Swiss-Prot record:
The gene is MSS116. It comes from Candida glabrata (strain ATCC 2001 / BCRC 20586 / JCM 3761 / NBRC 0622 / NRRL Y-65 / CBS 138). InterPro entries: DEAD/DEAH_box_helicase_dom (IPR011545), Helicase_ATP-bd (IPR014001), Helicase_C-like (IPR001650), P-loop_NTPase (IPR027417), RNA-helicase_DEAD-box_CS (IPR000629). The lineage of its organism: Eukaryota, Fungi, Dikarya, Ascomycota, Saccharomycotina. A motif (Q motif) lies at residues 159-187. It comes from the Eukaryota. It is found in: Mitochondrion matrix. GO terms for molecular function: ATP binding; ATP hydrolysis activity; G-quadruplex DNA binding; G-quadruplex RNA binding; RNA helicase activity; RNA strand annealing activity. CDD domains: SF2_C_DEAD (cd18787). ATP binds at residues 205-212. Belongs to the DEAD box helicase family. DDX18/HAS1 subfamily. Its main location: mitochondrion. This is ATP-dependent RNA helicase MSS116, mitochondrial. One of its GO terms (cellular component) is mitochondrial ribosome. Its EC number is 3.6.4.13. ATP-dependent RNA helicase required for mitochondrial splicing of group I and II introns. Also required for efficient mitochondrial translation.
């Protein structure tokens, strides 16, 4: 019988975790309101905003082929172009016609498998429940809550060694890596994972607190405990949301290998999109790994073709950044992977233990846990106090508020010029909303500042992305200019500060972005450059995530700075049109969720075009409604404030004049 774990139905022992949604103080910091110049009651909450089906976004970070590590970070209710954007209830499995059934090489009858594990069966229960209820049929797992304040005992590597929780070989390897102390999530999770062999684990911890080692250490200890049985067999499968995070986890495994020769016997292989499939299979056959790390799409491809060969003896499956996996739209893929692993397992369909690590635990993560937990007991380990901010307390956060969106660019460039020059070993990350905007800013900064500038986004091929990550990790100073592809899981040492121009694609991504600094117990800072119209976002951030930013500065652009930047643009008007339109499309898709008045914000972004060209009256030229239709603004009256719209000629010349931009396909 399939067991399930629900965070919503718990005993009185764990009633403290009933309100999983973090709520901040009802007293709102007045400084936001002072800058915005309005009363808070005038803004509607996120829940009051109905979804507008006409909201669309330019898909400028997707690719023609769907990848398991897509980097466009859109919500599932947004629309892209040419069929590339996630849609409601979309799964990457929709692109694979064979994924309703296992390949016959795995020993399954296709029709029987489809009836048993149909992707349309929301509960995935063995009894074939198709009710779609939140709690599937089946026996509920016993839930044990281990809260942050349940124990004040400090757990160290030495204490784990003395209690025989970890072996001498593993202790030596980790000690040689320079670990001074275990982080809270490591102290809470390592011993329960190792000693409670009949329990699944759900762990919640802030970003940048060492979740990777919290599951790698127990995995290695399990491999040591079952050394004879574990060699030359895949015993652990780790699922990561992006290629870069999967490769980073592989690097951490290699570090553990390098400190103890005995641990090298347990090989590791990564399976990610953008790499040669056949070469990966040959490498698995060559090294016979004990640990496989991958993104959902590539894992499914390999398991469908070679499941019986490689994945019959799995003991652990780990979901790292589970909330991020769900944001991208991988819920059905994760349930599908879980079903394949359980069915292929030679021990039993309930043998595999599940370790789920996440920075947030919303209803989506709860629903996923219902589908994939196998054991009769589930330990919920929480390292976050409900009353403390979700952002790392050692990050000094600052808002720089300008009058217009164009001010964001000037303020950021001035800041990087100043601190990049006077700060020794200045190492920073600049986050931007779209790929085109990222390319644009990287080009400008290469001319404006004397720092190594790295451009990083989803349209860069995987080989180059891996090289950029490795180079930036080793650099003592430099600037990484990137989209949200670098917001989660990426561990770059010694980041001085995190910079942001504008807003992230999802509210939690603000927390994950700034989490790239102040890692491993160090301090850091973040500076976000916004216009006054964007301030409501930070009201929601405080209400929903208890994050209050007290340092707020006003930016006043200097005319000579603006003129100097305009002279150094070296970009054609058509290219600038594309850049600004991509930003408009991005904001168009998320403004209502953030409580921002789009009638003020979108024209402000559009006027950046004229500002950068030193002609405030110049608007983006559009021929007809072709682009407006793609933006979902063909019937919006504010379009006339934003664009210079040339009406289509009469019926005898319907095509009419078009700029190069309007001839482009999206």
């Amino acid at each position: 019988m399939l067991r399930h774990c629900s965070l919503g139905l718990v005993t009185t022992q764990i009633s403290a975790i009933a309100p999983l949604r973090l709520v901040g103080s009802p007293l709102f910091c007045r400084s936001y309101q002072d800058f915005a110049g309005r009363d808070r009651r005038s803004s509607r909450s996120r829940e009051d905003k109905p979804y507008n089906s006409r909201t669309r976004r330019f898909d400028d970070e997707g690719s023609s082929n769907y990848s398991s590590s897509r980097d466009d970070y859109r919500g599932q209710n947004t629309y892209g172009f040419r069929g590339k954007a996630p849609r409601k209830n979309f799964s990457s499995r929709d692109n694979y016609s064979s994924r309703d059934n296992f390949r016959s090489s795995n020993g399954f009858q296709e029709r029987g498998y489809k009836n048993k594990f149909s992707k349309n069966t929301k509960s995935y229960s063995k009894g074939g429940n198709t009710s779609g209820s939140f709690i599937p049929e089946g026996k509920m797992a016993k839930m044990t809550h281990i809260g942050k304040s349940d124990s004040d005992i400090v757990v160290t590597l030495e204490s784990l060694l003395e209690k025989n929780v970890i072996s001498r070989d593993l202790y030596d390897s980790i000690s040689r890596m320079g670990f001074e102390q275990l982080t809270p999530v490591q102290q809470k999770t390592i011993e329960p994972i190792i000693t409670n062999s009949d329990s699944d684990i759900i762990a919640r911890a802030k970003t940048g607190t060492g979740k990777t080692f919290a599951f790698l250490l127990p995995i290695f200890q399990h491999l040591l405990n079952t050394k004879i049985d574990s060699q030359n067999k895949v015993k652990s499968v780790i699922v990561a949301p992006t290629r870069d995070l999967a490769l980073q986890i592989e690097d951490e495994v290699r570090k553990i290998h390098s400190k103890n020769r005995k641990l090298k016997a347990f090989e590791c292989v990564s399976l990610v999109g953008g790499t040669n499939f056949d070469r990966s299979i040959r490498y698995i056959e060559k090294v016979s790994p004990s640990i496989v790390i991958g993104t959902p799409g590539r894992l499914i491809d390999v398991m469908e073709k070679f499941g019986n060969k490689f994945f019959k003896d799995v003991d652990f499956k780990v979901l790292d950044e589970a909330d991020r996996l769900l944001e991208i739209g991988f819920k059905e893929d994760l349930s599908y992977i879980n079903k394949m692993l359980n069915t292929l397992n030679t021990n039993s369909t309930e043998h595999i233990r599940t370790l789920l690590f996440s920075a947030t635990l919303d209803h989506k993560v709860q629903s996923l846990s219902n589908d994939i937990m196998n054991k009769e007991e589930c330990l919920y380990i929480d390292t976050i106090d409900e009353n403390e901010p979700q952002a790392h307390e050692k990050i000094d956060q600052t808002l720089v508020v300008g009058e217009t969106f164009a001010d964001n660019l000037y303020a950021a460039i001035e800041h990087i010029r100043e601190f990049g020059t006077k700060t020794p070993n200045y190492k920073s990350i600049l986050f931007l909303p779209t790929v085109k905007f990222t390319k644009f800013m990287a080009t400008i900064l290469k001319r404006q500042v004397k720092l190594p500038i790295y451009e990083f986004h989803g349209q860069i091929d995987q080989k180059k992305r891996t090289r950029i990550v490795n180079e930036f990790k080793t650099m003592k100073k430099g600037l990484l200019v990137c989209t949200d592809v670098g917001a989660r899981g990426m561990d770059f040492p010694n980041i001085t500060e995190v910079l942001q121009i504008g807003l992230p694609s999802e509210i939690p991504n603000y927390i994950h972005r700034i989490g790239r600094t102040a890692r491993s117990g160090k301090e850091g800072s973040s500076v976000t450059f916004i216009s006054k119209e964007e301030l409501p976002f930070f009201e929601i951030l405080e209400d929903k995530h208890n994050v209050t930013i007290k340092n707020i500065r006003k930016f006043e652009a200097q005319p000579h700075v603006m003129a100097d930047l305009s002279l150094r643009l070296h970009v054609s008007e058509d290219e600038l049109q594309e850049i600004i339109l991509s930003v408009i499309s991005f904001y168009r898709a998320c403004l209502k969720d953030y409580g921002i008045n789009y009638k003020n914000m979108l024209p402000q972004i559009a006027h950046t075009y004229g500002t950068l060209l030193q002609n405030e009256d110049k608007r983006i030229p559009l021929a007809g409604n072709h682009i407006l239709n793609r933006l979902g603004m063909d019937r919006d009256p504010i379009a006339t404030k934003m664009f210079q719209i040339d009406e289509m000629p009469n019926q005898y010349n319907r095509r009419g004049p078009r700029s190069n931009y309007n001839r482009r396909r999206f």
